[in-house]
């Protein structure tokens, strides 16, 4: 199990029960280490309310282009993207950069 904070910013909160921040314990059967890829699937399974909203968040089984993903305020590309192994206290932020204006 890992305890993390997940943030949905830039309007993404509308697909996750209109809540911008979650403090969650993520536990997956048979896994000692939980990576960001596991967390993304956990979000789809547990936080996204409507199946149709999954495509707002994901494209081709990864975070949709236009969503900035940070792990502890560092671009996830520098941290290994979906392979980054989460640790207690990590903050994972998803920020949509695509919005009207």
Swiss-Prot record:
Family annotation (Gene3D superfamilies): 3.10.20.30
CDD domains cross-referenced by the UniProt entry: Ubl_Urm1
One Pfam family it belongs to: Urm1
UniProt cross-references to PANTHER family, sorted A to Z: RURM1 PROTEIN (PTHR14986)
Keyword tRNA processing assigned: yes
InterPro entries referenced in this protein's UniProt entry, alphabetically: Beta-grasp_dom_sf (IPR012675), Mopterin_synth/thiamin_S_b (IPR016155), Urm1 (IPR015221)
Protein name in UniProt: Ubiquitin-related modifier 1
Organism: Kluyveromyces lactis (strain ATCC 8585 / CBS 2359 / DSM 70799 / NBRC 1267 / NRRL Y-1140 / WM37) (Yeast)
Cross-link (Glycyl lysine isopeptide (Gly-Lys) (interchain with K-? in acceptor proteins)): 101
């Amino acid at each position: 199990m890992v305890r993390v904070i997940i943030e949905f910013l830039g309007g993404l909160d509308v697909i996750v029960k209109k809540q911008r921040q979650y403090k969650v314990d993520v536990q997956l059967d048979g896994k000692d280490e939980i990576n960001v890829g596991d967390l993304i699937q956990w979000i789809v399974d547990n936080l996204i309310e409507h199946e149709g909203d999954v495509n707002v968040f994901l494209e081709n089984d990864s975070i949709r282009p236009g969503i900035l993903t940070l792990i502890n305020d560092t671009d996830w590309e520098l941290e290994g993207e979906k392979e980054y192994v989460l640790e207690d206290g990590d903050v994972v932020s998803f920020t949509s950069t695509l919005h009207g204006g």
